[in-house]
Amino acid sequence: MNIKRFCTVLIAAVALSFSYTAKAQISDTVASVCAKHLTQEYISDGQVYRTLLQVDQTAEFHTTFYGGTTYRVAACSGLSDGNLIFTIKDPDGTVLFTNKEHKNAPYWDFKINSTVDVTIEAVLNSESAASGRAVILIGFKQ
């Protein structure tokens, strides 16, 4: 009886491990697609902002942009550009930028005049995806 339980637990653990590995590989693939937009002149902030989204969901990521710094925000979902809409808002909810007004551009460069905490909202482009991994990368110039 103990051997059956052990085998059942072992099989379940292996199955979960493969599932987790597959999801991690998908997410890493999307991050690699997104990373091509952080060219050599931009240094990554070291974070990979990622989540799984359904078409009716909005993800929120929080970060601080420091005054006097030029940033690049790259946003991807899937293996092609334009699948993720991102909006950057200040603490009052004022929209500082949205790529929706720029044909869902996969990245955008901007200079921050004064330090500000921001929320980056990400939603899938409903015309191209019903669900998917969303990845946002942030780089800055030194």
Each PLM stretch: what is its role?
Residues 1-6:
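Positively charged n-region of N-terminal signal peptides that target proteins for export
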Residues 8-10, 45, 57:
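Short, functionally important structural connectors and interaction interfaces within domains
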Residues 9-17:
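Bacterial N-terminal signal peptides
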Residues 18-24:
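Sec/Tat signal peptide C-region and signal peptidase I cleavage site
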Residues 24-43:
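Short N-terminal segments immediately surrounding and downstream of signal-peptide cleavage
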Residues 25-27, 48-133, 140-142:
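Acidic, Ser/Thr/Pro-rich low-complexity intrinsically disordered segments
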